[in-house]
Amino acid sequence: MGFLWTGSWILVLVLNSGPIQAFPKPEGSQDKSLHNRELSAERPLNEQIAEAEADKIKKTYPSESKPSESNFSSVDNLNLLKAITEKETVEKAKQSIRSSPFDNRLNVDDADSTKNRKLTDEYDSTKSGLDRKVQDDPDGLHQLDGTPLTAEDIVHKIATRIYEENDRGVFDKIVSKLLNLGLITESQAHTLEDEVAEALQKLISKEANNYEEAPEKPTSRTENQDGKIPEKVTPVAATQDGFTNRENDDTVSNTLTLSNGLERRTNPHRDDDFEELQYFPNFYALLTSIDSEKEAKEKETLITIMKTLIDFVKMMVKYGTISPEEGVSYLENLDETIALQTKNKLEKNTTDSKSKLFPAPPEKSHEETDSTKEEAAKMEKEYGSLKDSTKDDNSNLGGKTDEAKGKTEAYLEAIRKNIEWLKKHNKKGNKEDYDLSKMRDFINQQADAYVEKGILDKEEANAIKRIYSSL
């Protein structure tokens, strides 16, 4: 009974609830027309504003169901800002490095706060600032106080470096770097070359004068026992005595003839000079054949004249007076002519000196058997020499002067002939060919410089000037 009562109640509830739709029905005609109107027609402005404000509110106050996503987005924004800031810092640092290499270290130290800017070095009273010179000024273009060097200081510094390293290639290396960096032009390079050459010449002359004015002291073995070797050269008289009385005086062998860097620079016939003269086979063969001490003076003079002529040809090619081919042809003729004439002259002088030192023995006669007559002849000869010693001395001095003058004229005769040959082979015919004023000035400067260095005698220099001034 109870079961039937319950079933009736369920049936009543089902009937009252209405028809149940198992599948959704499509919207009516009104809904479809509204949808088409929304697609085709523009919505009212008020609706658009309201919808935009609703979207803004949703973005401003996100739902609490996704707190982690909002946190992640804020973290990403912070990382992006940091990355941009670091990138800008790096770009600024690179620009500062490119713009001023000297301030590179200061910019890096300012950007990095963890560095102490070398406080121990700055507050160390034992250091004078020279220890940091290499670090702060690697190129050496600034003074100790940080101010940049002037043009004269740079020229003097380059000349000093060439003088210290004894290498002409130092200037070429420096100029090539400056040209590659675009810091100077070709004309400025030529101007710098002239200024450096002038400064170097003044420096060499100054050092040579200081070297000559310094007191010269002879050194012996007893003075050098403590290991201290003086830099001064022994007097010339002691050296000459060492050559003349080497077998008789044993103390001369204890005398040291030392040479410092200045003497090596002023010596015109070093190994590197011989390397330059190897391109002239005849002349080089002549130099290697001259080894005697007596001919050392002639050898120095010969090398000086040859190198002066080589520089003269280089200058003519540089100024466009002659072509490089003509310069090469001139040097070939110069090599052959000077070598041949000098060799003949030296051989003649050698035979004359040998005949004076070793005269031919006279034929024996009956008078030589008489010792009394021989002793009488010797005494008479000695008396005659003592009677008029002044005349003999004057004649000897005159003979030496004539002999030296003859050698000099022999050397310079080769120069005169080669210059005449050079004039005959002139092919340009311009009015400015063979600018003799420039040539005379150059030769005069070189001759004076060689006289100051002690390479040439004053008479030889005057003879060279006289020949070039007579052209």
Swiss-Prot record:
The keyword Membrane applies. Residues 1-22 form the signal peptide. Glycans are attached at residue 40. It comes from the Eukaryota. Residues 62-73 have a biased composition (Low complexity). Coiled coil: none annotated. Expression restricted to the brain and pituitary gland. Not detected in the adrenal gland. GO terms for cellular component: extracellular region; secretory granule membrane; transport vesicle membrane. Keywords: Cleavage on pair of basic residues, Cytoplasmic vesicle, Glycoprotein, Membrane, Phosphoprotein, Proteoglycan, Secreted, Signal. Residues 28-45, 106-142, 214-231, 345-355, 363-405 have a biased composition (Basic and acidic residues). It is a peripheral membrane protein. The modification Phosphoserine is found at residues 40, 365. This is Secretogranin-3.
